[in-house]
Amino acid sequence: MAQVQQLTPAQQAALRNQQAMAANLQARQIVLQQSYPVIQQVETQTFDPANRSVFDVTPANVGIVKGFLVKVTAAITNNHATEAVALTDFGPANLVQRVIYYDPDNQRHTETSGWHLHFVNTAKQGAPFLSSMVTDSPIKYGDVMNVIDAPATIAAGATGELTMYYWVPLAYSETDLTGAVLANVPQSKQRLKLEFANNNTAFAAVGANPLEAIYQGAGAADCEFEEISYTVYQSYLDQLPVGQNGYILPLIDLSTLYNLENSAQAGLTPNVDFVVQYANLYRYLSTIAVFDNGGSFNAGTDINYLSQRTANFSDTRKLDPKTWAAQTRRRIATDFPKGVYYCDNRDKPIYTLQYGNVGFVVNPKTVNQNARLLMGYEYFTSRTELVNAGTISTT
C-alpha cells in the first residue's frame, strides 16, 4: 500500500495561501457581478481660502468603497495694474495641496499631494488624466466640455476660471478591488481630508519656487482667490451579495491597503549617487521623483542618470534622463512636466523583507542651493504586515 506523502509546514502554508487567494478571487467576481455600482455626491462646499482651506469630508458608510472623484473649481483675480501671471508647469494640479483618507477603523490610507495624485491617475489611465485626445475624425470629437481647464495666463485686472478633477483611489481599479474599503459599519465613520491652495501658496513671484503654485509672474503678489468650490462623489458597490454566513466578501482585497504617499529628500551632491531606500514589506507599484533643483525644473539637463538598485549594487535599470523618458512614453504616450521622472513597477512590484534591499538612485549633474528630491510612492501593504513595515524614507 502506497504511503501518503505528508506536506511540510512550508508546503501547508503555501497551500493555505493558494486556497485563500482562490477564495478571494471567487468572492471578488461574485461581488462585481451581483452588486450595483453607484457614484453618489456626498458633499459640496464653496469657500474663501483666505478664511479656511482645510476640510474634513464624511463619506457615506455604505457598501464597498472604491474611491472618490473630487471636482474643484476656482475663480482667481489678478489685481495688478499692469502685469499678468502664467500657469506653472503643475498648474491646476496644485489646487489641492494634500489629500488624506482614514477608513472606518481609523487606518490611514492615502496621504499625498495633488500633483502626485494627478500623476498617478495619468500613469494608470495611460494618458494625461481626463484630457481629450486629438483626432482627425470629421465628427467633432475633442475638448468640448473643458473637463480640466485653466487659462494659460490671467491678464492684469482679469479673472480666470479653473476646473480640476482628482480621483482618490481606494481600490486599485474598477475590476480589481485590492485596497477597497468595507464601509457597512454604522458605528464608525470614514474621513477624507482635503487641504486646498490659498493666496500664500497658489501664486509665485518671478524667481520664486513654483512647485506648489498654480500661477507665477510679476503680478503674483496682487492675485487672489475669489472663491473655491469642491464637490466630492463617492464610488461604491451597493447591494452586496449574501451567502449562508452573511455578506460574500473578498477578504484579502479588503485587508490590503492601496496607498499613495510622498516625502522630501535633501542633501544631494553633484556627480554622487543619491539613494532613497524603499521601505520593507510594501509592494511598490510606481515611484515618481521630482527634482526640485532649488526652484529650477529642467528637462533632464541637471541629471546624469537614474536607477533602481538592489542591495548587492546591481542596477535593475540605469538610464540617462532621455532614455528614462522614452520608457515613460511607452506608458503614457507623452512626457511628464520638466523635472518629473516616473518609474513603473506594476508588472513586477518591488517587495523587500529588509529595509534598504532596494533603492531609487539619482545621480545629479548640477545641484543648486536648496535642491531637494520629492518622492511619490504607490504601493500595496497588508494590515498584518503594516505593524512590522518600515517607514517611508524622508529627510
Curated annotation (Swiss-Prot):
* Main localization, broad class: virion
Question: Where in the cell does this protein reside?
Answer: Virion
Q: What's its job?
A: Major capsid protein self-assembles to form an icosahedral capsid with a pseudo T=25 symmetry, about 66 nm in diameter, and consisting of 240 capsid proteins trimers. The capsid encapsulates an inner membrane and the genomic dsDNA genome. The major coat protein P3 and two assembly factors (P10 and P17) are needed during the assembly of the virus particle inside the host cell, when the capsid protein multimers are capable of enclosing the host-derived membrane, containing the virus-encoded membrane-associated proteins.
A Pfam family matched in the record: Phage_Capsid_P3
Any keyword Transferase? no
What UniProt keywords apply to this chain's record, in alphabetical order?
Capsid protein, Virion
Q: Which domain of life is it from?
A: Viruses
Q: Where are the transmembrane segments?
A: none
Keyword Lipoprotein in record: no
Q: How does it assemble?
A: Homotrimer.
Q: What is this protein called in UniProt?
A: Major capsid protein P3
* GO cellular component assignments: viral capsid
Q: Which gene encodes it?
A: III
